[in-house]
Amino acid sequence: MAASTGKLRTLFSAHSSLSARPSSALPALRLTILRSYATTTPPDSSISNPSNPSTTVKRPPTAFKDKLNAGPAFSDFVSGKKDEPLDPAEAYALKTALVGPAGRKKEITRLPSWLKTPIPDSSNYKRIKNDLRGLNLHTVCEEARCPNISDCWGGSSKSAATATIMLMGDTCTRGCRFCSVKTSNKPPPLDPHEPENTAEALSRWGLGYVVLTSVDRDDLADGGARHFAETVLKIKQKAPNILVECLTGDYAGDLEMVALVANSGLDVYAHNVETVEALTPFVRDRRATFQQSLRVLKAAKATKPELITKTSLMLGLGETEAQLWDTLRALRAIDVDVVTFGQYMRPTKRHMAVHEYVRPDVFDMWKERALEMGFLYCASGPLVRSSYKAGEAFIENVLKKKRGKNVGSASGKGTTSENVEKLVAGEAVR
């Protein structure tokens, strides 16, 4: 009992000594506590802390930053969430009308008649879809939700149909704000059987013209260029007379990879600038630039001058007439042969809103202007896409002018198995 009482007295005396300390010691203690927080301003203004984030100068907001932040970010495309389809009010928000009795009118939206397309349900559409699924192939027609799929796939026979095969999977490493293709930083590995399966499918259909495109694969050292070129060579082996158009990415500006694809035996090298230079940072992934796209098209033509080069632009994003003129001049300066114009249509809620629905007569006007500037062919219309009826347009308007009658055998060069082996080994096919 005496020992317990002694302990209590000791604790009490220690507490009393702490309480009896002068208040002058407290400010030093408080200063130490405040300094333990990195974001707290010291009480003495003469004390400076260079590492303090609160002292860094913030850049004033800019119109570019505000506009970019208001739109979808890269993370929106890699979230893995399922896309929600747009309702008419969001997809066609620029065409509105007030309907209903007085005092209870409500605003509704109207779809321009020139943008209406039928629902794909033909037997030929189903046959092509089944063939693609059986060979584990993808098409940009489906992945990009092209409005022309019922027209392109709905012919009376497979030979009358047009399908754009999308190589290297259905997942892209870029997040362009207009495109509904799935996005991921780490897409699945390439299918080594895809070149052979693609060639097999196309040889079954007996097509005279095919369009190959691909997702961007920035995760691969060559951007997938060798895979792309090998597919072209396999197609030419199985169907030497088929005309092949390749709509490629920019391969992160690697012009050696551009040359590799250009030398693979294709007939048309296509790469889309998508929009005018001023809008490119808002529309495309930040890794894609307008000038880089021009360099790709220029390199393809320089590698093989007899190639047809082609590009495509979307209208309705907010571009001006002067900007379109500048774009066409830049394309002609590097000898691009074919250009197409189409209406941008917002695919999902995550993507850019439509700025304007361009009238069909305006598309006709730009077609005339492009032809007057020296383009060999221009397809221009609200529903025109880069590969829309590409074979028909190519055969009727480009090959007859540039290659004459013997176009079927013009692209048989460089299609031997020896070239395929060189390609896989990393050598350019000449």
UniProtKB/Swiss-Prot annotation:
Binds 2 [4Fe-4S] clusters per subunit. One cluster is coordinated with 3 cysteines and an exchangeable S-adenosyl-L-methionine. Residues 1-37 form a transit peptide. Residues 40-56 have a biased composition (Low complexity). Pathway: Protein modification; protein lipoylation via endogenous pathway; protein N(6)-(lipoyl)lysine from octanoyl-[acyl-carrier-protein]: step 2/2. It catalyses: [[Fe-S] cluster scaffold protein carrying a second [4Fe-4S](2+) cluster] + N(6)-octanoyl-L-lysyl-[protein] + 2 oxidized [2Fe-2S]-[ferredoxin] + 2 S-adenosyl-L-methionine + 4 H(+) = [[Fe-S] cluster scaffold protein] + N(6)-[(R)-dihydrolipoyl]-L-lysyl-[protein] + 4 Fe(3+) + 2 hydrogen sulfide + 2 5'-deoxyadenosine + 2 L-methionine + 2 reduced [2Fe-2S]-[ferredoxin]. Its EC number is 2.8.1.8. One of its GO terms (molecular function) is 4 iron, 4 sulfur cluster binding. CDD domains: Radical_SAM. This is Lipoyl synthase, mitochondrial. It comes from Blastomyces gilchristii (strain SLH14081) (Blastomyces dermatitidis).
